[in-house]
From Swiss-Prot:
One of its GO terms (cellular component) is cytoplasm. It is an enzyme of class 1 (oxidoreductase). Keywords: Antioxidant, Cytoplasm, Metal-binding, Nickel, Oxidoreductase. SUPFAM superfamilies: Nickel-containing superoxide dismutase, NiSOD (SSF109770). Its cofactor is Ni(2+). It catalyses: 2 superoxide + 2 H(+) = H2O2 + O2. GO terms for molecular function: nickel cation binding; superoxide dismutase activity. It comes from Streptomyces coelicolor (strain ATCC BAA-471 / A3(2) / M145). It holds the Pfam family Sod_Ni. The gene is sodN. Homohexamer. The hexameric protein has a roughly the shape of a hollow sphere with an outer diameter of 60 angstroms and a large interior cavity. It is found in: Cytoplasm. Its EC number is 1.15.1.1. This is Superoxide dismutase [Ni]. Ni(2+) binds at H15, C16, C20.
Length: 131
């Protein structure tokens, strides 16, 4: 009796963990822009409390950017994309490494490098959306 009460009524499945069409590299770009902006602000303020707060925010935003790039790589891009863009695996890896470097640095050049990589992913992403 109890087993029927708690048994699933409907079984569903999906090919992804998000509804289709939600993916967009803009999410990663916005977070990476925040990282670079914080790095620039850190250069102009020596207050130790500000530096601590800025470091926490910068690290959080870098992790969010890494998350969004990882979701694109693992959930959006499919084998046909990797066949058409064989550089995509390395590009994602380089982007994640650049975001890690920006996370651990006050130098806005590291934030810009991450943004440059994200721009390359963005270009490929929108090309795949046209197909």
């Amino acid at each position: 009796m109890l087993s029927r009460l708690f048994a699933p009524k409907v079984t569903v499945s999906a090919h992804c963990d998000l509804p289709c069409g939600v993916y967009d590299p803009a999410q990663a770009r916005i977070e990476a822009e925040s990282v670079k902006a914080v790095q620039e602000k850190m250069a102009g303020n020596d207050d130790p409390h500000f530096q601590t707060r800025a470091t926490v925010i910068k690290e959080q935003r870098a992790e969010l950017a890494k998350h969004h790039v990882s979701v694109l790589w693992s959930d959006y891009f499919k084998p046909p994309h990797f066949e058409k863009y064989p550089e995509l695996h390395q590009l994602v890896n380089d982007t994640l490494k650049a975001l890690s470097a920006a996370k651990g640095s006050k130098d806005p050049a590291t934030g810009q490098k991450a943004l440059d990589y994200i721009a390359q992913i963005d270009k490929i992403f929108w090309e795949t959306k046209k197909a």
